[in-house]
């Protein structure tokens, strides 16, 4: 009996179905690893923001949930999971329920084209940066669905503001990304990072595209709805904007989506302008820092991951500090800044970049 069972198990592992199962498992492993890493990254961002905000306001911040309050975000998430999920009695339940998921999924898909390190990217596409812009434009649709489905004037106004703000600041963002693609001769995120590796710190696109860098930062803050661009969630005007009618896990999804978007923006700033995983030392790419064997390749990949995350988290100090130092703009000021200031500057920067590339041919 035991021999027959062993033979059956052996025949299964040799069959075609077992190969398909193994293929499916190996397909899910990198995706699940990425989701786990993103979750940990969001928890770290929440803790950093609370601690930095407390320091700016001369408070202590979270300190009881885990060492130094590191588990406070996890405690808040568990609390939201067990809260009652209320539905508006006269709202559109389908749109109300689907809206948060659309916002979160569209942002999660953006992580698939981000190179976290050397040979550490889920999909290296030739149109990676433009795929990110296309995917990120889906998130405002979810916010508009949430605002309309809530059947609440404050929620609907917040959804309309979110859609208008996203459209206004995605357009200046696109010429900045196109300028980087022209300099790197590629739209692949991996190629863009490798194009910045030759001259170390001075080879970063930050110095080659200073105007585009400033426009990109401002547009990214507006896309993330961070102060001074948090008009869709202005508490004094709209209670909580499109989140007004939400509670429980659906409200938690919006909470997670805002920090996911913030992390995506920081990582793309790192990839496009701060050299990605490259060290700020000239002529020493991270791929050539170690001898080529399996152990050193794993070590080099780990180091490149740490370098990318260190740059991204250092950049996070800018959006966190602006939250407590700059006043909120009016809606007309926000739209004028996007259409009348940033868009002409971004187009002018693209024209200069194109001209310089043509002259250098």
UniProtKB/Swiss-Prot annotation:
It is found in: Plastid, Chloroplast thylakoid membrane. NDH shuttles electrons from NAD(P)H:plastoquinone, via FMN and iron-sulfur (Fe-S) centers, to quinones in the photosynthetic chain and possibly in a chloroplast respiratory chain. The immediate electron acceptor for the enzyme in this species is believed to be plastoquinone. Couples the redox reaction to proton translocation, and thus conserves the redox energy in a proton gradient. Keywords: Chloroplast, Membrane, NAD, NADP, Plastid, Plastoquinone, Quinone, Thylakoid, Translocase, Transmembrane, Transmembrane helix. GO terms for biological process: aerobic respiration; photosynthesis, light reaction. NDH is composed of at least 16 different subunits, 5 of which are encoded in the nucleus. It catalyses: a plastoquinone + NADH + (n+1) H(+)(in) = a plastoquinol + NAD(+) + n H(+)(out); a plastoquinone + NADPH + (n+1) H(+)(in) = a plastoquinol + NADP(+) + n H(+)(out). PANTHER family: NADH DEHYDROGENASE SUBUNIT 1 (PTHR11432), NADH-UBIQUINONE OXIDOREDUCTASE CHAIN 1 (PTHR11432:SF3). Pfam families: NADHdh. It is a multi-pass membrane protein. This is NAD(P)H-quinone oxidoreductase subunit 1, chloroplastic.
């Amino acid at each position: 009996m035991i021999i027959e069972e062993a033979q059956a198990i052996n025949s299964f592992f040799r069959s075609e179905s077992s190969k398909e199962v193994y293929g499916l498992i190996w397909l899910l492993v990198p995706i699940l690893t990425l989701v786990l890493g993103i979750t940990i990254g969001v928890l770290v961002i929440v803790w950093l923001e609370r601690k930095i905000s407390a320091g700016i306001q001369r408070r202590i911040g979270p300190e009881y949930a885990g060492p130094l309050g590191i588990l406070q975000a996890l405690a808040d998430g568990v609390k939201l999971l067990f809260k009652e999920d209320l539905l508006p009695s006269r709202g559109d339940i389908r749109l109300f329920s689907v809206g948060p998921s659309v916002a979160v999924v569209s942002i999660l898909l953006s992580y698939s084209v981000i190179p976290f390190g050397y040979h550490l990217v889920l999909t290296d596409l030739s149109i990676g940066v433009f795929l990110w812009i296309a995917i990120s434009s889906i998130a405002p649709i979810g916010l508009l669905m949430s605002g309309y489905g809530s059947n609440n004037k404050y929620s609907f106004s917040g959804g309309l503001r979110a859609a208008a703000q996203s459209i206004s600041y995605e357009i200046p963002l696109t010429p900045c990304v196109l300028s980087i693609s022209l300099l790197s001769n590629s739209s692949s995120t991996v190629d863009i990072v490798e194009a910045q590796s030759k001259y170390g710190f001075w080879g970063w696109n930050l110095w080659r595209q200073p105007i585009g860098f400033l426009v990109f930062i401002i547009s990214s803050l507006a896309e993330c709805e961070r102060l001074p661009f948090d008009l869709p969630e202005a508490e004094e005007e709209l209670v909580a904007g499109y989140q007004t009618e939400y509670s429980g896990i659906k409200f938690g999804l919006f909470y997670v989506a805002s920090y996911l978007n913030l992390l995506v923006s920081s990582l793309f700033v790192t990839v496009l302008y701060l050299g990605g995983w490259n060290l700020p030392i000239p002529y020493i790419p991270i791929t050539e820092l170690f001898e080529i064997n399996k152990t050193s390749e794993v070590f080099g990949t780990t180091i490149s991951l740490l370098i990318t995350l260190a740059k991204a988290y250092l950049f996070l100090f800018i959006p966190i500090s602006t939250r407590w130092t700059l006043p909120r703009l009016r809606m007309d000021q926000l739209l004028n800044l996007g259409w009348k200031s940033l868009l002409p500057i971004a187009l002018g920067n693209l024209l200069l970049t194109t001209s310089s590339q043509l002259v250098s041919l």
